[in-house]
Amino acid sequence: MLHRRYPVAARGARARSIAAALLCTVVFWAVTSVTIAAVAPVRLRWELGAESEKTTVLRDSVPAEFTLTNTGTRALPGKGWTLYFNCMEGVAIGARPGHVALERVVGPLFRLRPTAGFEELRPGQTLRVPLVHPDSLVNPALAPEGPYLVFDDAPEVGLSIVDYQVAPFPADHATTPEQIYERNLGIVPLAASRLPPVFPTPHEYERHAGTLRWTVRPRVVAPPALRAEADAAEAMLQPYFSSGPAAAGASTLRLAVAATHGLLGPEAYELNIDPEAGVILSAASAAGIARGLASLRQLLPVANAPDRGVVLPALLIRDTPRFAYRGLMLDVARNFQSKAAVLRILDLMSRYKLNTLHFHLTDDEGWRIEIAGLPELTAVGARRGHALRADDRLPPAYGSGPDVGNPYGSGYYPRADYIEILQYAAARHIEVIPEIEMPGHARAAVISMAVRARRLAQAGQPDANQYLLADPRDQSVYQSPQAYSDNAMNPGLPSTYAFIEHVVAEMVALHRAAGVPLRTLHVGGDELPDGAWERSPACQALMLREHLKTRADLWDYFYTRVGAVLGHHALSLAGWEELGARTVTVGDHTERSASPVFSRSGYTLYVWRNAEGAEDLANRLANAGYGVVLTPATKLYFDLAPYRSPFEPGQIWAGYVDLDTVFDYVPYDDIRVASDDPRHVAHRVGLSEAGLAHIRGLEGTLFSETVHEASRLDYMLMPRLLALAERAWAPDPAWTQQPNRARATPLHAAAWSAFVSQIGLQVLPRLDAEHAVLYRIPPPGLKRVHGGVLANEQIPGLSLHYTVDGGEPTVASPQVTGPITAIGLIRVAAFDRNGRAGRSSQLDNR
């Protein structure tokens, strides 16, 4: 699902109009077969023009260019070949294109072909093709990707262009080192003694005099009901002591389920470190014990050799989370992530007390979970690659290229892997909420079931259409934001509900086999394209039969049926905000309002719109009775770039989300955060007391269009995930409760300094030592002052090193300890404790 490429309201309309304009007219070719003994090697380069070169081909666009060079010994013929590539942001042919034509194939897949008059490209020759992109293409992650060649005499074979380069981006309007320096100026590093003892900030704590010293392995004492948590505690202590049982008379780590007086919620805990009594961890439940152990882990030495012992500060922590739901949405449909990658994410979530993995398993570009009885869902829907027909795979997307072996384009979780993920999460007291997208964003399922129907029909099976999701007679014309025209399940077909029932029953069975009962299923509900269903005979017949008058009625009918399926399996229903929201006209403006149809059904909606007229949408839905998970795009979408830069990957459709953006999020108050101008909030609705009770919690969101390597997953998540954990667990900070901005500002500055100091001095060093995570290391800020260069960093504790000749610094380069007075091209980079560098910044001091 990418409701996210095009922002809401006015900006969304503008972006959609650009996208529509970028669709090229389909061109048909009659090409004679060309026999080629060997494919000529080629080099492809894509380069974005400077903003000063604004094109007149399309408004709000920028020029670019493909440069195709024949690097082989044979000519590339004048006809009989096609260049395919993906481009999320859209592309059109530029002015004076020569004898080539460009068209969109499907979704983000485009192709470029020679037309009549094109001359062969001899060895060493270069073809230049002018292109036009929307001006939202501002970093390399959004550039064309995954190019490959196909020759007409071998139409099923896609040949990857390995020698593909994206030229460095122009730095027009990019965030500068000077701007970064100014943003970092307010950060005042704090000593550890002034920071909370554990992360996220606990509800309350008391530091006492003295220490508890463990010179030998302590005894872990726990009742049988906490056996799993006791085993986790033993494993946590293993690196610090020799193997074997605790010695007689050793100090104790005592675990107990007990009342947590004054602390509400099943995850509340009390951690008491006493020099005489040892460690006593009591909690309202086993989950609370797990959260307390996560805190205790942070108090252990970062690194220690066995038998060196452990010294713990005398301390009392009484803690409970602010929000019961603290989630992360991980998209593995657009680009697949391995089981090992998911387990690593669960480890991170457990460390920082997040308790829900919203697992986005299906979308237009992939179906990632094995469903017994429907093998086509993975045999077709889990594979991407080049093919003339969608008989055994989906088309390339997001740079996956022609090869079905690409591990990010293709892949799924077999039954055993999914069960292992569930059990791994459950052991860490993390609930997995799988998402099966419907009725939109369902192309992988729609195509897979069409392949199944054709196969069974050819075999003479009378029930070939048992799970068909598309009406064969449907003449509806629509286009999703991702440019698909065939991605919607049809609510007029009984087979659609048979499919949903089958999938839901199998998901329930998978969870039961894991010993982790499924409680909630997320059923999508976002971005059904305008025009879908409108010319479907099956839908028209259903509407006549059920006395439905509008497409909104058809929507409600669909989700009433879906809700009944989930109810039959005793499941709670969750979905994106669109499931329960409607657009209505009020006076001279439109606004998103709560539909009364499902408001008393116990459904939970994930609300992502929080800008451009939707600042109060979460309030309206919660006030109406819907459960609400706050997942605001402009604050908690981790697929967005941190700021404008040609070096920072990520989407920009909802703005930019840096570490401080997440930290600054104020739950319950998107209206105040959005604007101080009363004209902008005049029609906005506040959160009622009843509505407040319907807010379930917060969720960070990572869609994966740009995540096609393991390091990118870490880079996009961390350290922003830490700010999410702080905001979801920690008490409401003082600065959010101060209505006077002049008084709130210094409180906020102090809280921000404390947060970055804690993650820089305590959290990340432990992560460096214990859990290899390639988190984003921010580039330093730089400023020229009195002939020298000053440098600063967003995260205290990282070391800064510099060069004076423009070369990339290493950890062996001089360390920044004050103003850099050398004359030259100054380049500075930050390094973690393992000597890993972040992106460098440079400033000319000549």
Give the location of each predicted region:
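Asparagine-centered strand-capping/turn motif at beta-strand->loop junctions
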Residues: 67-73
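Short acidic, flexible loop segments centered on an aromatic residue
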Residues: 73-106
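Low-complexity, acidic Ser/Thr/Pro/Gly-rich terminal tails and inter-domain linkers that flank the onset
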Residues: 38-59
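Active-site neighborhood of glycoside hydrolase catalytic domains
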Residues: 480-602, 613
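Acidic, contiguous N-terminal accessory segments
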Residues: 38, 143, 148-324, 574-583, ...
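Feature activates predominantly on carbohydrate-active enzymes
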Residues: 268, 272-512, 516-520, 699
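Flexible, acidic glycine-rich loops studded with aromatic residues
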Residues: 572-785
